[in-house]
Amino acid sequence: MLVECRGFLNVKKQMTDLHLLHESIVDETEIDSLGHMNVRYYMFRVARANVELMKRSGVFVRKNPNQLIRRVDTYSRFRTEQFAGAKLNTLGGFIATEQTDRIDGATAYFEIRNPDSGDVAASFVITSDFVDVSTQEPIDASTTIDSDSKYLVEIPDYGRPRSLSLAKPDVGTLEEIEPVISDEQVPGMMSGRHENVVYTEDCDDRGRLREEIDLMFVLHRRNPDEEDVSFGPPEFRDLQGRRYSWAVMETRSVVFARPEAGNKIVSLGADTAYGEKWRQSRRWMFVKDTGQLLGISDTVGICIDLDARKAIPIPEATREAIERNYLPQFA
């Protein structure tokens, strides 16, 4: 019996081992302000692996230049820090969609492993779809993965979400979200309001933001005069003088559309839940002038002592700011 996916992948439930799809070594330039490989470079590796999986399996066969493959839903779980010089292998395979409650499309599971330590550095559940470049609409281009396909795998228990839901998110509009976002900037986790412009050099030959560029990195890019400043989460100090910041543990990003060169993008973010040492946030990204929803991003992070490299309770001033501004109705 086939498991149906609207989009381009149908699969039968017979699972095999994960397949090696990408190999790399962590470069010094990929190390951020927390002293470890930044989230964006995990995403770079898994995006390459996703394309490689499509090619090897024969799922991604471009029929005309007006169609492309897009990651429309990306769940990430980060497990162990990786440092400069570490060798990393990215492995994965397709999964039956009945294992998840995600949006339609072809869903795959990936892991980034350190073969020297044996650690699983991060795991991912990704849904991709064929998209018409001109209309930005999904294309119905069904393909079947046979029951004996070596590319069909199962999500291990440790790769499943811990805190975030993979259900279809409630979207909301710019008119609904903007009035409830406070002007107060709660330290860390990209809360509050942020704006930036899509540069021409960020775009493909059609003038649309390239598929491999994450909207969050457009919104929070460094200015040219900040090239020598370490990138990554900002550093803070508590009343005891400890250096602390926020380490991302889980993320989920859903893409609805890609902006064009010159578009002004606005990100509206707030905490939706928190505990003694952690917080969960949601960010909505819109084209400012039209109100078009581009994407929704959820993040779970823990407060860490940067010197002791361990989780600590959220400092009181930050906790109070979270309490004043959080939006539990969006959790």
Question: Where does each model-flagged region fall?
Answer:
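Long, contiguous hydrophobic alpha-helical segments, chiefly transmembrane helices and signal peptides
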Residues: 24-26, 31, 37, 42-46, ...
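Non-catalytic linker/capping segments at the edges of enzyme domains
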Residues: 2-41, 132, 141-217, 318, ...
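HotDog/MaoC-like acyl-thioester-processing domains
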Residues: 18-22, 73, 77-87, 94-176, ...
